[in-house]
Amino acid sequence: MHNIRIGQAVDIHQLVEGRKLILGGVEIEHSKGPLGHSDADVLTHAIGESILGALALGDLGKHFPDTDPKYKGANSLVLLGHIYDMMDEMGYQIGNVDATILAERPKMAPHIVSMRTNISNVLHCDIEDVSIKATRGEKLGFVGNEEGIVSLSVCILEKKG
């Protein structure tokens, strides 16, 4: 394997009433949350899948299938911890992560530092190595109409040592 590897991913979930909105392990008060088998944390899913992609290990569904009852309601930060273990065993560490959340509401800015802290703690890297941004759908499409939420992630992994 190379000394530097790049991964990218996108995660999309439908927003529905009666579900918690959890992003980067932070529960955010909102009338809707993402529909999914686990806690449906689109941010953490995208980050985890970008790491899996950088390592050429496939996608989240390969490692944490939504057909497996043990992942029902799973905390996505725990799943990210398993992905970290895979990365560590392969001799890689985080160079940096850059992620974007696309959601019409609520405002993400008050929660970004907490998200970055949670992600950097699980990935055993400096908070400065984790960038999280948010943007709105400007009332366009399924994001703008508050029917769904999206997160994109790019990561660089570096060979340890």
Which residues does each PLM region occupy?
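SAM-dependent methyltransferases
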Residues: 1-3, 160-161
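RNase III-family endoribonuclease catalytic core
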Residues: 2-113, 123
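Short active-site-adjacent structural elements
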Residues: 109-110, 139-143
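Short, low-complexity, polybasic intrinsically disordered segments
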Residues: 112-116, 146
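Glycine-rich, mobile lid/loop segments that gate access to catalytic sites or pores
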Residues: 119
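Short acidic capping loops at alpha-helix termini that bridge into adjacent secondary structure
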Residues: 126-129
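Pyridoxal 5′-phosphate
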Residues: 132-136
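C-terminal edge-of-domain segments
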Residues: 143-161
